[in-house]
Amino acid sequence: MTESVELMNKYGEPLRYDRNFTGPRQRDRSCTDVPCLLLFVLFLGGWAFIAQYAIRNGDLNKLLVPTDSFNRKCGMDSGVLNKKNLFFFDLNQCIDPLVPITGCDTPQVCVETCPRETFVWDTMKDKQSFAELHSRLICLSEEHKAQIRTKSDIQDAINQNQCARWYIKSAPFLKRCLFEFSQGVCDYIPSFLLNGGRSRRELHMLPGNATTEVQMQADVMYQKMTDAQALVVPQANGKQTPVDEEPIIQCKRRLNEAVIKEKMMQTDTRLAKLVGNMVAHFYNGTNDAQLLGEKIVEDLVNSWSIVLVACFCTLVASLIYIALMRWLSAPILWFSIFGVLIGLLVGIYFSVKQYIHWENTPTVPVHGLNLHSTVKNVLQNQNTWLYLSIFVGVCFVVILLLVIVLRKRIRIAIALTKEGSKAVSSVISTVFFPIFSWILFIAAIAFAIGVGLYLGSIGDPSFRMVRQLTKSGEVTTEDCVCEGPAINYTVGGSCKPEVFQQYCSVRLTSFFQNRNPCLNTTCSFDSINNPIEIKWAIFYNVFGFLWLSFFISAFSYMVLASTFARWYWTFKKRDVPYFTLTRAFFQTAVYHLGTVAFGSLILAIVRLIRLVLEYIHEKLKKYDNAVTRAILCCMRCFFWLLETFLKFLNRNAYIMCAIHGKNFCSSAADSFNLIMRNFLRVVTLDQVTDFLFFLSKLLLTAGAGASTYYFLDNNPSIIRLNYIAVPTTVVVIAAFLITSVFFGVYSTAVDTLFLCFLEDCERNDGSPEKPFFMSKQLMKILGKKNNLPPRQRRGK
């Protein structure tokens, strides 16, 4: 009792009854935190001004300038000043979804213009003269091309990847030379090049890798494609007979699009290699890792339909789970708890059984460097199962003790969860409201990235004199001498490409003035020197994204809080209006955007401080100073705790603002005092409900994963897989994300109803003048009841 009085004196008196109080339904609301809203609007106006300035003065071409195999920026670096386009020796290697991440594994060279004709060495070498062939060659450098004297030299240069084996009429796109196909060309390309199901071996049978097996087909292709290149616009005269009788629909739409789709469906791609490289970090045996990566990607490609169906079923199951919780909240939540406990018991039994089996069954370890051998050794080791059984047993005991100790609080949590399920089911549109937030988030991210890129392109480019690296990673050595205006140029120093190209060269002899251009030393693009005002604009853009993203999240939260509070403070639930979410949306948008802007501004400032600390931490990593590391660690920890606390405070402030319509500071103070006056209830019930929601998500996720695994394991004829665990893992991850969205709405509902419940307990006493708004179940658990005349009673 003394403790309650102390809390009451410290955090204010309990709320008093107000007969005019109607919660979010009150009509005498006024706009809150208007100055902060005006500040936010002005800030957005400044952001828009920066955006238009960046778009008008920025040039994304500076950031999208292609780089050749020698790390020279086409059209910018010395030696390639007049060569602004990038040519790929084998464009087939570049049509891959992961090329932006992994790069294009083919020689690339800067050219003045993209090739305007087709060249196929394997077909043309015996049909044209050396001079004609030499004129069509595209090589790594003009020096390589100048050293070619015969057709044999051409063959050697092509075999050594110094010159392109083949190319097709191309056009520049973002300064990259891409194939220029017209629809007429599609009629003349053999089907073996466009068959959607062709294998990797068939891919290597392109003109650039022609073999004896396809020499005849390559001849036909060259002849037909040479004739077809002129068909930029289909001719009006008689149509020639195509190579294939059936039309190639994908090619008709667009050949490049068809090739990209096909490449995305191939399994032996860079994605497989990337997965294989990731796996290779965990065990020895690179070849096996690459094979495993190929199989994993193959399973992902083949099982995408199963994954989508499983995700849809998870979504439906979550909705059914929500609907059932409205009437069967207690059984379902207890089932979730006991389901996890039973699952842990089964895990203990299986682990102990496996431990006893392998303890009594001596085995010889399989000596191998592949993954299969490693996994087999681990599973046949009795200690593995011993440690696993101990871990699962500890988890079982901890969860069981928590359930026993918190069983009384769990009853109240179940009642609150039931209230939340009623509220969500009553306004089912709240479940899909997060989609609105996602759309706004995506738009904010796209806008911030776009503005950032344009801002980053404003400024003068800086160049440095560098030496190229060999294939083995060693620095090249070259006697590159500069004179005249470039006499002070040094490796690593700044330079100008035009001056470098004119006054820097390799001295062949010390007695004669014979010089050649520097090949292994270049004046290369280093970075763009942004003016100081542009750097501040970039900082403004980063803060703008933080503020806007927190604003979107806060707005969404307040709309949901207003919806659920409106439901709670409606005495007769059948009187809840149909468009509750819509009314809450417009009420928040009209009256409380200033409060949303205020709360999001506070979080944005704290997050910006955290980002600055992370930046300082990265910069100071090279200085091994224990004191600096300790200070930074303490500051990072402090601001992380501060942001976590402010998020908690903001959420409750938004709820109180949605209920009472007060400004941010008043709402934050009221919610904080209300929580502190009921501190034990808040801590216990909040944690219990979070725990129950986590168990429910775990149950749905485990059910989705187990169902997927069981279906695939018992129906092998439906889909052919190497590892059933691959699609199962994807389904588990997707299911957890889906359930997190649904239970995120639930969490908002419970948080809102809980504050309403606490206020209801303080404001009302159950008399006819001051009836409780809580459900009968909650009143029964708390030992309270409404003393109402029969005609004033309501059904719960």
Swiss-Prot record:
Transmembrane segments: 35-55, 304-324, 332-352, 386-406, 431-451, 542-562, 585-605, 626-648, 691-711, 724-744
Membrane-protein topology: Multi-pass membrane protein
One GO molecular-function entry: transmembrane transporter activity
Localization in the cell: Membrane
Keywords from the named record: Glycoprotein, Membrane, Transmembrane, Transmembrane helix
Alphabetized Pfam families for the sequence: Choline_transpo
Highest taxon above the source species: Eukaryota
Glycosylation site list: N20, N209, N284, N488, N520
InterPro entries: Choline_transptr-like
A single cellular component GO annotation: membrane
Gene Ontology biological-process annotations: transmembrane transport
Predominant subcellular localization, coarse grouping: membrane
Family statement drawn from the similarity comment of this UniProt entry: Belongs to the CTL (choline transporter-like) family.
Protein known as: Choline transporter-like 2
Gene giving rise to this polypeptide: Ctl2
